[in-house]
Amino acid sequence: MSKPFKLNSAFKPSGDQPDAIRRLEEGLEDGLAHQTLLGVTGSGKTFTIANVIADLQRPTMVLAPNKTLAAQLYGEMKEFFPENAVEYFVSYYDYYQPEAYVPSSDTFIEKDASVNEHIEQMRLSATKALLERRDVVVVASVSAIYGLGDPDLYLKMMLHLTVGMLIDQRAILRRLAELQYTRNDQAFQRGTFRVRGEVIDIFPAESDDIALRVELFDEEVERLSLFDPLTGQVESTVPRYTIYPKTHYVTPRERILQAMEEIKDELADRRKVLLANNKLLEEQRLSQRTQFDLEMMNELGYCSGIENYSRFLSGRGPGEPPPTLFDYLPADGLLVVDESHVTIPQIGGMYRGDRARKETLVEYGFRLPSALDNRPLKFEEFEALAPQTIYVSATPGNYELEKSGDEVVDQVVRPTGLLDPIIEVRPVATQVDDLLSEIRQRAAINERVLVTTLTKRMAEDLTEYLEEHGERVRYLHSDIDTVERMEIIRDLRLGEFDVLVGINLLREGLDMPEVSLVAILDADKEGFLRSERSLIQTIGRAARNVNGKAILYGDKITPSMAKAIGETERRREKQQKYNEEHGITPQGLNKKVVDILALGQNIAKTKAKGKGKGRSTAKAGIVELDMTPKALQQKIHELEGQMMQHAQNLEFEEAAQIRDQLHQLRELFIAAS
């Protein structure tokens, strides 16, 4: 099923890219465990990495610091590798409240979560691709270091079907039930099967557009065919097919029974400890909760919060790392850590926060001590599991630089010829009035401005002041959710307003070529928000505009400011020299606004073509591409209802058109999920 990686791009590497690609590939072939790609904003870092993947033909995981950047990378990689498996693996929770206990108020908070089904399907698709083929790029968030089902058990639970295989219908149905598929003869949806005489239709959990029909004759598999679950039209017949479990957390029955005995042993030991310490309430609470879970596991094969018993279910010893997405990545896989100066500290912090919450639950009798082993990876475990790694950042952290030694690959020259912003330092005393006049100059020529302040209060006051003086301004702060944040950035690019004020939310993130001025207030206040890395990242937001400029308001030049200005000047001089040598005139980027959200859009269109003769492709069109994420979500719910109505009325042509449109809208919505 694997194909070689085939890079699809109208451009050839240029600027610093050819040298960066060569050095990274040589380092990987020489067996270097760590390399750093120091690439400035707009230098084509993703294109460089895509070239390395295509040349070396190795399965790759790309780690991004948040869902927004993961979505952007997923869209870019899907464009570079349309014929290969580009997968998306982020947390599938739209909302997640972990269970917790607050001793001071004696409050227990139950676990509460809302799962995004589309992202769950994409996660299952990602692990399937890693197990089945080598031409895989998985774009993941830090969700990749959290516990996942054991790959060995996952592989053991698969159902392999081949034409001519001797197996009766009841055996297939029993195996499907073990894989947590449910029978539903009325509503055929993902993770279900239906039975009609000797025919079993199965809708694989990792698929959203193809189902399997198993035709039996006299306890023998006579035919296996793939069909469109909506129209019922057969796409092709296959000699064999593998059904993957509905969830990553399936466990064979014998393993569950063995785990139950181990849980009972731990419960008995823990009860003795609690009684010895005169913790009678905690002992009763723990016994009651655990016995209930054991009964559920015995009857149903799972229970609410079964992940807290994952150590027993996967057969690990106390303190051993949980199985994660890294266990699915082949031994010769490649890891790319994007925006590594943010992602690496995130990985280090996940374990500590999780541990503190669970220790309280164990101490007060809500969970057994083994629940502490249901956790994300510790940083040292991540280091041990990580394959050969490339760290990508415009401002690499000390960790990456230390690990890479001399292997820091510079990518400072942009193929577009764009120069780093001109930097000016101006006094603090007149910063607000000076900023107002700069904003008016930019607004007059239809360009945008980003302003970063030190405190929330100052951001609010500045926004109010600018509004009073007639400027079109918005304020971006930590209380705004992902969906609304993307709406604000989109509106800024479309020119709905001219100025965006924020604190620490304007650094690493989406490309905004329309921004020509970045103003940093109180730049001379040394600290986290005004460190060398923060300043370089913030200045870089204006690096995609031909008129890019950064104004640092400060009464003195701090060491961080001096380093940031020096590094920006170095990059600017190198680009200027390259432009002169090659006769390049800097060109601004004309990136469509819909690119922020348009993930896999072309792929969705391609899928829609030719799925049955005579079908007209859905006009997913222009209207939807310009919609806000909230409107997209509303539109998706509306269309799903229409699609099911058409299917019930046997109007399969119309239902299929809407289904193709839903494909595209769901891809667009991923960025904000």
Curated annotation (Swiss-Prot):
Forms a heterotetramer with UvrA during the search for lesions. Interacts with UvrC in an incision complex. One of its GO terms (biological process) is SOS response. Its main location: cytoplasm. Pfam families: Helicase_C, ResIII, UVR, UvrB, UvrB_inter. The keyword DNA damage applies. The gene is uvrB. It comes from the Bacteria. GO terms for cellular component: cytoplasm; excinuclease repair complex. It is found in: Cytoplasm. The beta-hairpin motif is involved in DNA binding. This is UvrABC system protein B. The UvrABC repair system catalyzes the recognition and processing of DNA lesions. A damage recognition complex composed of 2 UvrA and 2 UvrB subunits scans DNA for abnormalities. Upon binding of the UvrA(2)B(2) complex to a putative damaged site, the DNA wraps around one UvrB monomer. DNA wrap is dependent on ATP binding by UvrB and probably causes local melting of the DNA helix, facilitating insertion of UvrB beta-hairpin between the DNA strands. Then UvrB probes one DNA strand for the presence of a lesion. Belongs to the UvrB family. ATP binds at G39, V40, T41, G42, S43, G44, K45, T46. Residues 26-183 form the Helicase ATP-binding domain. CDD domains: DEXHc_UvrB, SF2_C_UvrB.
